[in-house]
């Protein structure tokens, strides 16, 4: 299967979004790039080959790994390839750089004046915000919270008076603990949503307040998880926040 009616791929670096889970969300431009890019820099080479197979297309270019632990070392090699051809950057799901590899390559491209463009598409952050049912006109995305309880609680404390909606990813193994800490620090009655397995067969959007969601998550929340917490208000500030500090 070939994708017709599209312009030839440009020289340089292409950042392309891949489906979160439903291959039907793959854009025509992504499919075209997978077929014709000279080099595909993939977070997981097996995943991108499986995606191409699911889409019924063949990859003609070279596929190399480009993940968190090797992307800085890989950047120069990819920039050299992009100087005379097309390098397609994809991650396991969603948009490169958004809590995923890609930044080192884009920074190196800017230094070498190599063109960079984007083939937009699926992303968990706006998808979760749209499905949350919360007031999310302004939001703060903070990737993954710290893994250890101490730094995680300090992170939540720093968000106590954040008026924008807060969106972050979390491991299913830690989400119950994180939600319980958020309920304790931000307020158990703070509206929130847990978005699980977005666009996949078992997609689930669980809405409620932080206290309710923390209790629900104790039984186990599987899959890839995005959490959205509604922003606070001036009325939500704690008494301690309102006590004038001594000069």
Which residues does each predicted region cover?
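A contiguous loop/helix-start segment that scaffolds small-molecule binding in enzyme catalytic cores
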Residues: 2-5, 10, 86, 165, ...
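Conserved helicase motor
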Residues: 64-72, 144-149
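Alpha-helix capping/helix-boundary segments
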Residues: 46-48, 95, 124, 174, ...
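Short active-site oxyanion
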Residues: 34-40, 113-117, 165-166
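Short beta-strand scaffold positions
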Residues: 42-43, 100, 169
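Glycine-rich, flexible N-terminal cofactor/catalytic loop recognition
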Residues: 1-67
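Glycine/small-residue-rich loop that forms an oxyanion/phosphate-binding "nest" at active or ligand-binding sites
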Residues: 67, 74-123
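Class I SAM-dependent methyltransferase SAM-binding "motif I" and its flanking Rossmann-like core
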Residues: 104-162
